């Protein structure tokens, strides 16, 4: 799947924690952010609080 660039602002303390996580798991910052977002969304889908992508695409 093609990836698109997304920009956002984050506090310095959060970036420090993110970089530590990335180094621990040998990820770059982008990979760590993608992993965090994927986990957040998967948790929401499994709890039924967010519609699955397939359902959204059918609208």
Curated annotation (Swiss-Prot):
Natural source organism: Acidianus two-tailed virus (ATV)
Top-level taxon of the source organism: Viruses
Protein name: Uncharacterized protein ORF59b
GO biological process, one term: regulation of DNA-templated transcription
Any Pfam family hit: RHH_1
Disulfide linkage: none
SUPFAM superfamilies on file: Ribbon-helix-helix
């Amino acid at each position: 799947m093609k990836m698109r660039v997304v920009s956002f602002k984050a506090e310095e303390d959060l970036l420090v924690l993110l970089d530590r996580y990335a180094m621990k798991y040998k990820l770059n910052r982008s990979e760590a952010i993608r992993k965090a977002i994927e986990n957040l969304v998967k948790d929401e889908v499994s709890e039924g609080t967010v519609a699955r992508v397939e359902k959204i695409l059918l609208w």
